[in-house]
Amino acid sequence: MTIAFQLAVFALIATSSILLISVPVVFASSDGWSSNKNIVFSGTSLWIGLVFLVAILNSLIS
């Protein structure tokens, strides 16, 4: 169970880092938002899901 928690935390940190870099790049590009809107929403949905997964796994470990 601890390994699953650690992998979920790593995935959350990696997703956060990717979104931290990619979202400003998408907004700064000229046609970026209209062409990459689905990717940004998918990444945000993944991030929210990982937050809940980490919270659930944390409650099971503690």
Curated annotation (Swiss-Prot):
Membrane-topology annotation of the record: Multi-pass membrane protein
Main location as per UniProt: plastid
UniProt subcellular location: Plastid, Chloroplast thylakoid membrane
Gene3D superfamilies: Photosystem II PsbZ, reaction centre
Keywords: Chloroplast, Membrane, Photosynthesis, Photosystem II, Plastid, Reaction center, Thylakoid, Transmembrane, Transmembrane helix
InterPro entries: PSII_PsbZ, PSII_PsbZ_sf
TM region positions: 8-28, 41-61
Recorded GO CC terms: chloroplast thylakoid membrane; photosystem II reaction center
Function: May control the interaction of photosystem II (PSII) cores with the light-harvesting antenna, regulates electron flow through the 2 photosystem reaction centers. PSII is a light-driven water plastoquinone oxidoreductase, using light energy to abstract electrons from H(2)O, generating a proton gradient subsequently used for ATP formation.
Subunit note: PSII is composed of 1 copy each of membrane proteins PsbA, PsbB, PsbC, PsbD, PsbE, PsbF, PsbH, PsbI, PsbJ, PsbK, PsbL, PsbM, PsbT, PsbY, PsbZ, Psb30/Ycf12, at least 3 peripheral proteins of the oxygen-evolving complex and a large number of cofactors. It forms dimeric complexes.
Family: Belongs to the PsbZ family.
Protein name: Photosystem II reaction center protein Z
Gene: psbZ
